[in-house]
Amino acid sequence: MNTSILSDRAYGLLVESTIEDIRALNIEDPVERWLVFVETIRLESQVYCSRKRNQEKQIKRRCEKGIELLEQNPRLNDSLELQVHYEYFKNKLNDWTRQQIEGHQVRIKTQPRFEHCEPDIDFYATLEKKTSKKRVISHLKGADGVTKYDTEGLSDIATDFYTELFSVKRSDEGTTLKLLQNVEKRVSQKHRASMDRIITREELRVVVAKLKRNKTPGPDGIPAEFYQYFWHLIEDFYFDFITEVEKGSLPEEKNSSITSLIYKNKGDIDLLAYYRPIALMNVDVKILTKLLSMRLVTVLPTIIHKSQTAVYGRTIADNIHVVRDIIDLVNRDDEEAALLFIDQEKAFDRVSHTFLYKVLRKFGFGDRFIHWIELVYSNATTRININGFFTKKIPLRCGVRQGCPLSALLYVMIIEILALQLRANPNIVGFTINNEKLVSSHYADDSVIKITQNRCFKEVYKELADYQRASGAKVNYDKTQGLWLGKWKNRKDDPFEELYESDSQKITWTSGNVKHLGIYVGNNDPITQTFKEIIPKMIRRLNFWKPLKLPTLAKSRVIEIFHASKLFYATNFYAIPPDLEKIVTAAFLDYINFPRKKAVMSRMEMEKLRGSGGAKLINIKLKAETPKVQWLMKLVTDENLGPHRYLFERLVSPQTGPLTACQSIFAETSYLKRCKIENSFYNEALLGISKLHTFKNYPDINDEPFFYNKIFVTSTDDEIHDKTLTPFKGNKVLSKIITYGDLLNAAGTVTQPKLMAVIRKKLESIEHIRENVESHRIFGLEDGKEYEFESVSQKQIYSELVFHQSRDHPSVGKWSIDNLGVVDWVKVWDALHNQFYTEKTKSSIWEQLHLNFYTTYNFNTWHNQLQPCPLCRKIPEDVFHIIHDCKFTKVVWKRAEKVLMKIYPRTPTIHELAFGLSDTRKEDRFAVVLRNWVTFTLRHFILLEEHKTYKRNENSEVKLTPSYEKFFANFNFKATQELKLKKRLYDFQGLKDKYKSIVTVGNALAHLADGEFVWNDLL
């Protein structure tokens, strides 16, 4: 189903009539009624989509024909009527192109989609073609070793492989009982009652609202957007259906799925063992499983050991930090140790259902919750998608489906049984950290076992064998890797050699590096190997994106989302080598400036926040430093990171002089530089956090690295005192405004029970901060006591605190003071980035300011009066002239004054023409948004004319007509389309009155006639 039809009024009426027709059938069985509804909607939607697609193709052909005829007409440049028709056809064709681009973007999962870029369908078509080509399975090798290339042969191989994979996995009862004896933590009575409660309509509404969009639907073809859009109509049908299902079972057609195969980018591409099967489930069943997962996610942290990190409140980074620090510590102290990186064959798909249900009961889950799990998995089937062709149905008699919201959470409990057994075995030593045994760490199916004695190898193999017999799992010994450390680095033997049950089982042992959770760890410079693998791929992707025409703001966002994510994931654990950092910086700037040969602005200017006139381009050094600083913050605030703190102390304390490693967190930069800490990760982290140890009269957010996003305040004091920040003296705590740097400094010096007093009323007066307060604990004080704190986001209080600063842009200079007075850039940008502005408007404003005003060569030539105005030939031309004093500009403003006054009754000023309205009453904000929209569009038109005339190098005055009429004919059409789109959005959100108040302000852009919106002509 094409989700664009959901906003069509005709389709909405079709859905309503379908529901009424089904109600008229008086089907008593809720399950049958739901099945009839889903099948009817599926067929009706297919017909509607086909009809709409044909209509759009006809419109496209008409527009192309119209454009062709008009371009051949010699009167086109002289006739305003022909120009309006020409613009109409072009805009219609652009709309069609954008729809096609959006389709490409959805299919290749390119998010976010940039509405303000020029339509470039060829770019996205090429990108989709490349993506689709990767998904095609050209050949497969069967169990008999014969390679097949035809569709029938591929389907037969897939059917045989997955029929065997999803067949019943025997669970040895005796071994299961032995493993389950180690389970000590059980679900509390409160949590058990919460898990077993009846499903309510309110809970279903929350679940439906949280469904992810732009996801491939299941076999019935109905996407999540359909449920979100029409939930108010279908809620009764679905609630009755799910209530009835609990009494019996899920219908087979509902509990079926399509399995899509995704190559893992490793291993033989012709073997299905190297493909990840993703189940595309029907959304009506996914609603149920998501509801159960939302209940389960809050319970798991109470029953799962902290060595597992695929649990709410824990992160994948916790595992990698432990592995990296253990390797560094063992190698430094030359101890005996080895790490075993376990690889399981199809870990999610081999879970025995019998074992799963026993594990749930052992952990103490109630009968109703387990019954729901059994319903979801009891009679499930799937069909494999091979290049668009589907195999016959395959029963799912084992496994937890990847693609189901429940699967990862259920698997966490399965692998916990292995972790418990490894810890319970007294002959598996591992590491002892803070009197706690650390034997293994797990993130979903990625497991690492720590071995420190030769006798442990045999015991580990035995426990893995027991786990396989009980759960149905299968360890891939030939893909499992072992890493020798310390004294064992030169070992060449395989300690498991005599234990293997077959010749095909053989662990690969190395003294080099091993890739773990996307990061190389090991003995041979894993830092360089990690970044040298990531950076070239990132640069190739950047070069591919260069042809797509995007504004600078959008390019900065593209870098952050699409290209730099893997790079900065690696910086969570390693410091980027300086030579590679230079390569990355050059690649980013090259992409930002393309196709310009000369940079628009300096890198430092680009890295500033938008609120300071920058593009928020990633500051590589700061961005790479930030996760390291945040890790140190977490070390001193998270009570679950005891082992990590111990390793940190062991690694760093010998190099920090009289201070312990944790105390060095509060040391000054000069002290840390003298320490010369060898570990590059912790050296960068400590130097980074030392930058926060500053005292100021006010917490200047711009002076602090903007990635450090927490400001702490105490939860006890209610008094406000605006005094200079002063260190603590005895029992007396002088009042302060506290940043995180102040907190760290104080925590390292004071020993009194009361830590600090803060400004509180100021923060509490900000409503949106009070609503977003989170609870935190701070640890590591000398007396060992805990203090409660609350934290708020720096972004939330930025707009309030920044008013304490005097922040005129240095480039504004004499022009703004002489002609406009001192410009308050905070208010200017606050107005420009109003919440009602679209991304297109924001980007357009930014481009105008930076490409035409105070940050480029153009401003210097204007300001220094080096060239005449190309529009009116008056000398000199400066920024003030081009915006207000130019003869051409005055005519434009005069033509627009009537519309501006109609929107908001205030005479246009120089300040407004340059920067828009800002200091207005709250109740006038809708009018201000509309008036600024028109003002910015006018200014954009003026600047476009100036650029075009300058390039043509004309020596005569430029006349307003017909360029003005043509431009605003185009603007009026686009404005109408954009407002109509926003109307559909507000209608969907139930905000019709809000929309009405926006578009009908002063009846300037639109007015109501007989209850319908009528769009005005702005000419």
PLM segments and residue spans:
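Non-catalytic, peripheral interaction segments enriched in hydrophobic/basic residues
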Residues: H116, H305-K306, Y312-G313, A444-D445, ...
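Short, charged alpha-helical motifs in flexible N/C-terminal segments and linkers
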Residues: R53-T163, R197-I242, E246-E252, T259, ...
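Short, conserved micro-motifs composed of acidic
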Residues: R192-S194, L375, G388-F390, V460, ...
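Extended C-terminal regions of large enzymes
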Residues: V584, K598-Y854, N858, L913, ...
